[in-house]
C-alpha cells in the first residue's frame, strides 16, 4: 500500500522484474459511496485485527472492506464528522491496549471503538493544552501511555483515564 496526495496505490510483490509490476490506483469517486472520501493521505494504519485504515487530510478515516487490494475498485467504509469523528482533517492513528483507536486531528483527539463504531472526542481545550497535533506517528511507551506529537513537543495520555464528564448543569 502506498498513500499519495492523489489516492491509494497498490501492487503485488510477486514479480521477477520491475517491468512486470501492475499498479492499481484508487481515488475518490463522488458517484460511488464505497470509494475513498479523500485523496490526500496522511497515514495508513493496520490494527491488531488486521483491519486497514486510511487517514485522509479532508475526508476523515476510510476502512478497507474489500478482500483484495489488487483492484482499482477497493471498497471502503468511511468515518467522517457526520459519523461522529472529531474532524475530517485527520493526521494519525494508534490502537490502545483495549483495542480502541485514537485518531489525532489538528486540534482534537478522537477515541473510536471499532466494535460499536462509537466516537468520543476530546478537544485540545479538554486536554488543557494550547497546541495542535502533528502528523508524527504516535507510539506507546513502556507504561502503556499513548504518545502524540504536537507543535509544542509531545503529549502523553493514559487511555484508561480519559473520561468525558457526565455533569449536566
What are these regions (language model features)?
Residues 1-169:
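Carboxylate-rich, polar loop motifs that coordinate divalent cations or form catalytic acidic clusters
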Amino acid at each position: 500500500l502506498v498513500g499519495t496526495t492523489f489516492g491509494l496505490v497498490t501492487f503485488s510483490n510477486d514479480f521477477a522484474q520491475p517491468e512486470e509490476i501492475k499498479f492499481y490506483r484508487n481515488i475518490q469517486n463522488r458517484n460511488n459511496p464505497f470509494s475513498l472520501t479523500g485523496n490526500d493521505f496522511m497515514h495508513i494504519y493496520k490494527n491488531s485485527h488486521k483491519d486497514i485504515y486510511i487517514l485522509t487530510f479532508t475526508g476523515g478515516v476510510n476502512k478497507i472492506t474489500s478482500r483484495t487490494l489488487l483492484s482499482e475498485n477497493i471498497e471502503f467504509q468511511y468515518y467522517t464528522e457526520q459519523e461522529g469523528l472529531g474532524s475530517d482533517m485527520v493526521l494519525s492513528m494508534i490502537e490502545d491496549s483495549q483495542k480502541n483507536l485514537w485518531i489525532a486531528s489538528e486540534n482534537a483527539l478522537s477515541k473510536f471503538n471499532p466494535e460499536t463504531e462509537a466516537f468520543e472526542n476530546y478537544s485540545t481545550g479538554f486536554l488543557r493544552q494550547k497546541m495542535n497535533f502533528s502528523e508524527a506517528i504516535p507510539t506507546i511507551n513502556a507504561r502503556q501511555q499513548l504518545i502524540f506529537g504536537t507543535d509544542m513537543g509531545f503529549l502523553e495520555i493514559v487511555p484508561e483515564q480519559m473520561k468525558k464528564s457526565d455533569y449536566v448543569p
